[in-house]
Amino acid sequence: MVQLNQNFIDTITQELPAHLSMDEFIAACDRPLRRSIRVNTLKISSDDFKTLMQPKGWTFDPIPWCEDGFWISYDEEEQLGNALEHIQGLFYIQEASSMLPPTALFTPSAFTTSTKWQCVLDLASAPGSKTTQMAALMQNQGLLVANEYSASRVKVLHANVLRMGASHCALTHFDGRVFGEYLYESFDAVLIDAPCGGEGTVRKDADALKHWSLDDVLAISETQKALIESAFLALKPGGSLVYSTCTLNRLENQGVCEYLKQVYGDAVQFESLSDLFDGAERATTAEGFLHVWPQIYDSEGFFVAKLTKTASVPRLLPEPKLQKNFPFTPASAKQAQGIKDYFQQDLGISLPDELIMVRDDEFWLFPHEFNAFIGRMRFQRIGIKLADSSKHGFKVRHEAIIALAGKQLSPTAKTVDVSDVEAKEYLMGRDIPLATAGKAQGEVIVCYGGAPLGMAKHLGNKLKNNLPRDLVKDKVLLLPEQTKSL
């Protein structure tokens, strides 16, 4: 039974729209959430994913605000985080409401082929659901800066970015309040899914509101005001900003947006989201924001606001000095050609036309747009590591295969397709015996279902596992095929 603090009920009763009832709200909070996932279109189309999973008993109900999001039905005893297809990065387990902010930011009118955003900021990124959703919407083009304040959550963010094959990300680990100072008016678009009271999450955490207090809400809202101001300062004139929370009270939602409008006046223009998807008007506020109460769409509670920065605004602090000792240098023409030839001739992968950078014996691939950010802030991770070099040649890195061995694979690529059982063995760090012995082929890309799992060394009679030790799984779930379609 859900635990709703009486002080919370008293506050929300005053804020609940007239057409919604408190009884319906409480009943919705007490229902389990529907299971939802988002297909990772960096690796597979939604149609192909449905074709892959329907024989395994999955049914798909489209989420109206996310083209690649679905409520799913399946055997709920299965731990989907251990599923082979999840480990491969074919899908992300993501609550339906949390797919709203990237959708609101990347509306067709704001993101067209002729005016693609080059630099996007996700100010509070971990664990990575919205970051990887935006990476897919950007089709791994441009630069996506993903920031996370918590050190432990940066590791989770990095793991998810790699798993999903998001190659154009640069990760930072800062308090989000510094971005307006360090990267003033640098981004075409900014998403801030702000830390909040989490009132909308009660359907998956029955105790989320047990200790609710107005003092806590007031304290959190002050942090949110500082964050949205920093995000606004980091936004270019003409750019778009989406502010979202998974909470329900006005202080953390409309109140934060109204604060920004009070400070910056006409430079802040609220954009209506009433036409974002069919039925959006049911959650649209007078300002044009989306205030998603859990009973409206049978989802988590959520808030989403979108605004345009109509004019430049003065920066609050002097521009910081450029930082020195950036550890990467551009590859020479000879080095760049060497790594391109290795990927093309040995692996069958055409490297994208991006910056090839070198650090010691490491070769990296950076987005071109990152050039403008060198020295302006310290980055935890940039782009993808391609390979290490030695006197014997190059040694490809796992993350490069995961990010690049998809659409860039040529027909001559050295791949070995494995069964689901063999894929499970591979992900658990074991070598794969080959049914028919043949000539050793050296480095090969191991694939399952057309998507890469990683590298192995073809020794003629077996595939010697080259999966990085830190990615070896203790458990891999093979979802069984059903005897009849559902």
From Swiss-Prot:
Residues the record lists as binding S-adenosyl-L-methionine: A124, S125, A126, P127, G128, S129, K130, E148, D175, D193
Entry keyword rRNA processing: yes
Family matches, as PROSITE patterns: SAM_MT_RSMB_NOP
CDD domains linked: AdoMet_MTases
Enzyme class: transferase
One CC-aspect GO term: cytoplasm
GO terms classed as biological process: rRNA base methylation
Enzymatic reactions: cytidine(1407) in 16S rRNA + S-adenosyl-L-methionine = 5-methylcytidine(1407) in 16S rRNA + S-adenosyl-L-homocysteine + H(+)
Gene3D superfamilies attached to this UniProt entry: 3.10.450.720, Vaccinia Virus protein VP39
Keyword set, alphabetical order: Cytoplasm, Methyltransferase, RNA-binding, rRNA processing, S-adenosyl-L-methionine, Transferase
Annotated GO MF terms: RNA binding; rRNA (cytosine-C5-)-methyltransferase activity
Catalytic machinery residues: C246
InterPro entries, alphabetized: Methyltr_RsmF_N, MeTrfase_RsmB-F_NOP2_cat, MeTrfase_RsmB-F_NOP2_dom, Nol1_Nop2_Fmu_2, Nop2p, RCMT, rRNA_ssu_MeTfrase_F, SAM-dependent_MTases_sf
Subcellular location: Cytoplasm
Superkingdom as given in the UniProt entry: Bacteria
This enzyme's EC code(s): 2.1.1.178
UniProt similarity note: Belongs to the class I-like SAM-binding methyltransferase superfamily. RsmB/NOP family.
Function as written in the Swiss-Prot or TrEMBL entry: Specifically methylates the cytosine at position 1407 (m5C1407) of 16S rRNA.
Record HAMAP family: 16SrRNA_methyltr_F (MF_01579)
Protein name: Ribosomal RNA small subunit methyltransferase F
Protein species of origin: Shewanella baltica (strain OS195)
Phylogenetic classification of the source organism: Bacteria, Pseudomonadati, Pseudomonadota, Gammaproteobacteria, Alteromonadales
Gene expressing this chain: rsmF
